[in-house]
Structures are given as C-alpha cells and as structure tokens.
Amino acid sequence: MKKPLRWLAALTVLLLPLSALAQQQGLTIDIVGGSASATPIAVIPMPYQGSGTAPQTDVSAVVGADLDRSGQFRTLPAAQIVEKPTRGTEVQFQTWRTLKQNYIVVGRVMDAGEGAYRVEYELFDVAKGERMLGLAMTARANAMRDVSHQMADAIYEKITGVRGAFWTRIAYVTASGKGGAMRYALMVADSDGYNPQTIVRSAEPLLSPNWSPDGKKLAYVSFERGNSSIYLQDIATGARELVSSFRGINGAPSFSPDGRRLALALSRSGNPEIYVMDLGSKQLTQLTNHFGIDTEPTWAPDGGSIYFTSDRGGRPQIYQVAASGGSANRVTFQGNYNATASVSFDGKKIAVAQGSGNTYRIAMMDRSLGSPSWSTLSPGSLDESPSFAPNASMVLYAAREGGRGVLYAVSSDARVRQRLVLADGDVREPAWGPYRTAH
C-alpha cells in the first residue's frame, strides 16, 4: 500500500515520442458486477453499408460497452435483439416496449471515400416513440473507436444531462519481469484500456503521473539523476522538461486547473512540505511548514486551494490549504487512514484510499448535501491511488489481486467495476485524463 512517503531507487529512463512508438502489450478488460436498477437501453448493431472494406471497429459494441461500464445503463444482450433497424423509420417501438427497453440506438456505417467512414445514428425514447438525438460523424479507420466513444458521450449526456467521459484517456505505469530484469513503462490508453501507447520506458519504477488540464503533457517522478526529480513531458512529441531536482524528495506533482502552476512535495528544507511552482518563472511558494509529513497535493477545481495528505495529527489524513499559503484545515475525520485524495470537478466529492488495520479500500466523501457522507467504492484489501473521471461518474484506482497489480474503474455509485489487467505483469499508478476536444 502506498504510504504518504514512497520514494524508490534511481531510474534509467528511455524517453519515447508517442507518435514514434509501436503499441505495447495491451490490457485485458472485463466488466464486473451490474445493477438491476440501471436504465435499459438497446444498442442495435450498426452494419456497414458500403462497397469497400468494412471498418474493423464494431461501433455499436464500443458504444454499448461504454454505456454498460458507466453503471447508469444496462444494454440489451445481443441474443435478445430480435429486430435490427438501422434508421428511425424502421423502428417498431412496440417490440422494444415489450422487451422493456427505455431507449434504443440505431445507426449505420457508410463509405465516405478516401479511406474514411461516415456513421449516422439516432437515439429514441421508446415509451414516447420520439427521437432524442440524430447525428452523423466522419472519421478515418484508425479513429473509429474515438468516434464510438464520442457517440456514447452524446447519448449519455442526452439522457442523463451529464457530460460523458468515455472519449478520454488514462495514464498508468506497468511493471513486468522479475528481480533485476524488472522493466517499467509509463503508458497512455483510451479510457476503456484500448490503444495503449508508451510514453517512457525505465529499468526502475516510475511514479505519480499527472495530466495537464489540456491533456497535452504528463508530469511524473523519475530518479535518473540519482535522486527523485520531476519532469514534464509532451505526450505527442516526447519532448520533456526537468522542473524540480532539489536535494531530497521531489515528488507528487499536480497541475493547477489553469495549467500554469504545479503543486509538489519537496524536502529541500529537511521535511516534506507542499510547494507551488510557477511553471513560467519556476518560482516556488512554500505552502506548509510543519514537523509532520506533508505530501500528495491535489488542486481544488477553482484553483484557490490544495488538498494534501499529512500525518501531522498522528495518522495520515486529508488537509486543505489556500494556494497562497496559510493555515491548513483537516478535511477527513472518518477512519484512521485517509490518503491520496482525488477531487471531483465540482469540488463536492473527494475519493481517498481509506485504511483500517491492514485493509485499504477506495472510499468517497460526498458533500453535495452539506454534511459529508461516506461510501465505499472498492471491495479489495490493498486498493490505492483513486482518480476521478472528469465528470466524476467513475473512479479509476489500483488494486492487488493474486499478488499482482491491476486497475479498476468503478462507477461512483459502486454499481459496476471494470477490471484492467496486464497479461504479464503489474499495472499501477493510474491517472484519469481531462476531456478531449475534436480538432
């Protein structure tokens, strides 16, 4: 389990531009659990209606899997799809009412020329027999999964009123091999684990990846200089910048919401404290000054304050301090161990690794109604490193199963968990990236 201090041996790092890399071994993905109260929706297969080569991506399968793993929806199994309309005029609503479906998605894929495809799809309210959404998107073959995720986002938002977060990316660290032959990699993949690509390879562990708010860079910890150092790396080009290599600990980087500052934990004065660095001038502002260990900073959504882990009260708990410094206030009071906070986009929810004895689970404190209420999101015994999706509908975290590291993405109501497992080795240190924008 990750404790407030977790600094490892020196690194030898190979830096790799994203565009120049072959994809590494991917993650095996499966969905665990479900909920009878999830909204029923039929996502009908979308056939290819063209004369050329059909795309390899099964658009409807990707859309359905996205909706399933959100915990908000339950898609109709393929064996129960008794009719296969491809457009609204072909939908027999009584059929889907009989099958007790609230919504139905239909569509088709067509040849758009020059190696591109056009996807047209529609969303209907089954009870009312009314169309809620009708859109068309065009993309090349290698972007069809992106299109599918964007379709799922639009459907999710139209029904729930909440922006979808399927077309996003996650970062994580993999570890494979044994003993002196261990190898590590900082990876970026789609939010469902597909399309993994390597950002950094290393002969020693890598730590604490953190996304810039525009999704273009990652901050992370490296030991290649003989001491922990913090780097910023451009995901597309592989270009990187050393931003912190003070004597002692340089750890736990966290981008501010405007991307102009970096919160970090430094022990340059002897004890680990929370600092903020202006990334333009590289000027440091020390926020905490306490004999306890202060680490794992993460920003409040408005950029006005920073949450962090501290054992100043005797055991690790979450505290909050103004981004300009000052006195810190304790935030968590339930349990003897709360660490590695992740804060939702609206600041109302905080996910933490919560410990009791030798058991560590992911818990969430919800302040939406004023007084904080707690819920447990994970069932494991060694769960850590929670990271909210940008819409706070899911939480990504690391777990130990059978002596190896895996990732889970759990819906924020704990209805559904998606497991992401490396076929040969461990996966750890997850970080959910920001919303993406189409160019």
From Swiss-Prot:
Q: Which residues cross the membrane?
A: none
GO CC terms for this protein? periplasmic space
Q: Where is the signal peptide?
A: 1-22
BP terms from Gene Ontology? cell division; protein import
Claim: Signal is one of the keywords in the record? yes
- Stored Pfam families: PD40, TolB_N
Q: Where does it reside?
A: Periplasm
Q: Does the keyword Cell division apply?
A: yes
Q: Which keywords are on file for this protein?
A: Cell cycle, Cell division, Periplasm, Signal
Main localization of the protein described in the UniProt heading? periplasm
Indicate the quaternary assembly: The Tol-Pal system is composed of five core proteins: the inner membrane proteins TolA, TolQ and TolR, the periplasmic protein TolB and the outer membrane protein Pal. They form a network linking the inner and outer membranes and the peptidoglycan layer.
Q: Describe its function.
A: Part of the Tol-Pal system, which plays a role in outer membrane invagination during cell division and is important for maintaining outer membrane integrity.
Provide the family line.
Belongs to the TolB family.
- Please name the NCBIfam families in this protein's record: propeller_TolB (TIGR02800)
This chain belongs to which protein, by name? Tol-Pal system protein TolB
Q: Which organism is it from?
A: Xanthomonas oryzae pv. oryzae (strain KACC10331 / KXO85)
